[in-house]
Amino acid sequence: MMDTHPTQAASNQREPAPVSLIQARGLTKRFGDMTAVDAIDFDVAPGESFGFLGPNGAGKTSTMRMIGCVSPISGGTLRILGMDPAVDGPQIRARLGVVPQQDTLDAELTVRENLLIYGRYFGLSRNECARRADDLLDFAQLTERASDKVEHLSGGMKRRLTIARSLINEPEVMLLDEPTTGLDPQARHLLWDRLYRLKQRGTTLVLTTHYMDEAEQLCDRLVVMDKAKIVAEGSPRELIAQYATREVTELRFAPGVHDTLDGKLHGLAERIEHLPDRVLLYADDGEAVVAAAHARGLQPETVLVRRSSLEDVFLRLTGRSLAD
């Protein structure tokens, strides 16, 4: 088990540690005439949980495939664990744990057999595979399902097994591509708990996600990607403080009313965003915004005052919501 101090240190730092486990400078990926990743820079420190946040097509998965040494870079430099993927790909992959966006489990094998066979790929002895499999089944809360065929597992169980399998080689860095896509809320929260336990152990996590709450829960630091570029970087709290107000007021009006609102909303908030189904008003005191709106005779059908999130950061940076 790795020492837990790097995780604690990383979470208290505003800048990357001097020694990076992963370092990219001008990292670029092209597919013919299309640029999927456009000259991005980032560092991942030991013990850090680092995220790539952005919509589908932003370049997140292409970046992860380059880090995982399964897709060559088209330009710039990339160093992983101090090595060059173009030269040291097999050595790097032996020290990584990879959780792809789509599960690649052997459906006809049992839960335990999936772990044992994967361990053999890394040259582990049968006894060592068995020991690690027992530990990982317990970690993934799948001990009671060890003899079940994978095809009989729920989506959340399959995802936990995929993560457990990626840990069989005791990796220094975990790569997780959209780890909770398609899972129900209960399964997502259970998976977050397992990943948080890995953070506590000091395992370095690198993940992609388009879920704002997931990024806020798991990431010490993240980059926001859009159209193949990095448009912002920082901790979730730093990004929200920099690009949003403390609170957001969401007002929904009857159909046809939105087009008549511009003059009536002017001056109510520091920033106003018009979405197809609602208006967002950014100000530190949401209740004061609601009172001022009512004082102007506005009658929204629904009112919601909430704290700002990374969704608001993305909207500020790109002019659209992450769901667009």
Annotate each PLM feature:
Residues 76-87, 91-92:
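Conserved ABC transporter NBD signature motif
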Residues 174-177:
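Catalytic Walker B motif of ABC-type/P-loop ATPase nucleotide-binding domains
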Residues 149-153:
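Conserved ABC ATPase signature
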Residues 170:
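Conserved catalytic motifs of ABC-family nucleotide-binding domains
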Residues 192-284:
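ABC transporter nucleotide-binding domain
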Residues 116, 120, 127-145:
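Conserved ABC ATPase "signature" region
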